[in-house]
């Protein structure tokens, strides 16, 4: 199994998963990069997975299905191009891997992550829920949903690999350094982020640099209190405050 990021639009990644001469594409924002990848590598499109109904994630799905009409499009019922509707707990296979659908709302009220389990571990295609060193903005979901989705991710094995759909790592790390200026892991990651792609990332790495996975730490809560001017009584409060601070943050 080989997993490759294909750049699209401004900062999107369409993840291509290869097994033999077949491939899956995840969140095809536009069809042309996928078609070029398939032709260049002499692959047939076997499946398409869509995490949520934003144009930069599902925009190319319908065109790809028209070109490969035997290739199913997986997504929740609000994905217009979906030919195979999924819900939390849906399972199917690709190659020698087992795919399980998780509901990971927050960015949107219905957001799917696809967990691909293979002999070398768990691969999570998480759309706009988790980014390296950050999290998605809240649009039609709620911040409480997003917090719960992060808590669920955090219970996975530490070698789990995450495949977000955007290359936001450098900007997220600058905010993370604003929250934890003495965190050496963040400074090291910032230097490495000059070389893209920075993805995928392990859960172990994210636990060291992602402030939204570090809300249980007293010094993170104290910093969020100082910057927000609010009293934070729980990890959820800290998560909410960090998201609000990130919304307002501008790199100097």
Swiss-Prot record:
Cofactor binding summary note: Binds 2 Zn(2+) ions per subunit.
Enzyme class, UniProt record, top EC level: hydrolase
Record pathway: Secondary metabolite metabolism; methylglyoxal degradation; (R)-lactate from methylglyoxal: step 2/2
Family matches, as Gene3D superfamilies: Ribonuclease Z/Hydroxyacylglutathione hydrolase-like (3.60.15.10)
Transmembrane segments: none
One GO term (biological process): methylglyoxal catabolic process to D-lactate via S-lactoyl-glutathione
Family that this chain belongs to: Belongs to the metallo-beta-lactamase superfamily. Glyoxalase II family.
Function noted in UniProt: Thiolesterase that catalyzes the hydrolysis of S-D-lactoyl-glutathione to form glutathione and D-lactic acid.
NCBIfam families (alphabetical): GSH_gloB
This protein's name: Hydroxyacylglutathione hydrolase
Gene: gloB
